[in-house]
Amino acid sequence: MGKFSKQISEANRAFIAKQHMYFVATAPLSKEGRVNLSPKGLDSFKVISDTQVGYMDLVSSGNETSAHTLENGRITIMFCSYDDKPQILRLYGKGLSLIHI
């Protein structure tokens, strides 16, 4: 059974730091819209505090992640490892798009 926490623990931070890839999921409020799940990587993710994280997203045409986040803020970020001890860590929260022009 999964464990839930309102804060990112030191063990979570260590796990996140070891991952080379993570996934970001967002969805619109509309029933007609679709859930968007995007793989992310490189060195684009940062734990800011026990309750805040950030990542840099490279915007492309049809960027649903940014559109959904601007619409409703709902976001899930998932890290997973397939080592000797497989593990999944999901961060559920409210996202904020900061657009730099």
Each PLM stretch: what is its role?
Residues 39-96:
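A short mixed-secondary-structure module that forms the rim of ligand-binding clefts
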Residues 99-101:
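Conserved small/polar residues in nucleotide/adenosyl-binding loops
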Residues 1-56:
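N-terminal structural module
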